[in-house]
């Protein structure tokens, strides 16, 4: 059986949602959630849930968020055999939403996946052509 190799981002999503009218320039009460995200990781997880053997080639930091993503991939059945451990922090997306779920602001730190160079993928050429 063939497998799919996904090359893409994996990051931790931090979402803050105001429980009332958002007031700028101050702390607002609300709920904060943390979840595994990233377009590449999301695609890989959904393929694995469909029963497709899936490997994710991504860049993770050697930090707590990297551990969260490694655990989430393991639980979803997504292989990380070729994941690269970077000096950068694991990708993080921080979003602040209004009570209605409208975007107020967001910040992303994708320096880990942005550090991926084509030369780092050359060693996977044979596997990529067989996937």
Regions found by a protein language model. Name each.
Residues 1-59, 64-68, 74-75, 93:
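Glycine-rich phosphate/adenosyl-contacting loop at the front of the ribokinase-like
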Residues 2-3, 79-81, 127:
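Secondary-structure boundary/capping motif
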Residues 53, 79, 103:
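Residue-level detector of anion-binding/catalytic polar loops
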Residues 58-62, 84, 98:
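Short glycine-rich, polar/acidic loop-and-turn segments at beta strand-coil junctions
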Residues 72-87:
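A glycine-rich helix N-cap at a beta->alpha junction
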Residues 85, 95-131:
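Conserved phosphate-binding/catalytic loop of the ribokinase/pfkB sugar-kinase fold
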């Amino acid at each position: 059986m063939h497998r799919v190799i996904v090359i893409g981002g994996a990051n931790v999503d931090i979402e803050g949602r105001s429980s009332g009218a958002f007031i700028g320039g101050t702390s607002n009460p609300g709920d904060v959630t943390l979840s595994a995200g990233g377009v590449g990781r999301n695609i890989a997880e959904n393929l694995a849930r469909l029963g497709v053997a899936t490997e994710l080639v991504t860049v993770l930091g050697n930090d707590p968020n990297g551990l969260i993503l490694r655990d989430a991939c393991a639980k979803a059945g997504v292989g990380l055999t070729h994941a690269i451990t970077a000096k950068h922090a694991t990708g993080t997306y921080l979003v602040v939403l209004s009570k209605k779920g409208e975007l107020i602001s967001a910040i992303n730190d994708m320096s880990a996946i942005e550090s991926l160079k084509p030369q780092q993928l050359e060693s996977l050429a044979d596997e990529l052509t067989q996937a």
